[in-house]
Amino acid sequence: MKKPIIAALLSVLILSVSCDDQLGMFGGPVYDREGNLAIDRVRIAEYLETAAYDSLYRVHDPATGVVVIVQEEGVGSRPRNGNVVYANYTGRLTNGNIFDTNLEDVARANDIFNEERNYDIFTFFLGQPASQGGAIEGFSHGFRRLRSGGKGVIIIPSPFGYQDNPNLPNIPENSILVFEVELLGFD
């Protein structure tokens, strides 16, 4: 009699553990990084067909789908993993809506100003996760292509941005992010 009860309890335990493994970071299904990246590559190509950006050149990273449109070259070397990067940025969705910036005048002009926030130079460790002083992964891929004083646009597929995070009021889940950036320098 004990063996069927133990077997039933073991089955329930195994099922509950295997179901927990199928939950993603935000409680939903596991995030499909490759599937979303494939979709975003198409969406970015369509966006670039209609988006008018002046540029010196474009860099498409085949592994990540990140696109960097270099508008002003800058000088010197490019930052590497571990460098502290100093930058200005304005983040938009592909529909043009601005969702974030570190520039107070841009925030005020676009009704996203928050008086509790400091609008300072954005500082992060290149190649580090946000939880360790870094930024979203797409920033690291994009800023590696710029030089000090350089300006550009970094287009980031959702797997290298905020993925399917439901907790961002101005950024829908699985959004492609478009950042206008200026690399002020790095240490």
Show which residues each predicted segment covers.
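Positively charged n-region of N-terminal signal peptides that target proteins for export
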Residues: M1-P4
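Flanking scaffold residues of small Cys/His-coordinated metal-binding clusters
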Residues: S11
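C-terminal motif of bacterial Sec signal peptides marking the signal peptidase cleavage site
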Residues: I14-S18
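Cross-family detector of peptidyl-prolyl cis-trans isomerase
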Residues: C19-D187
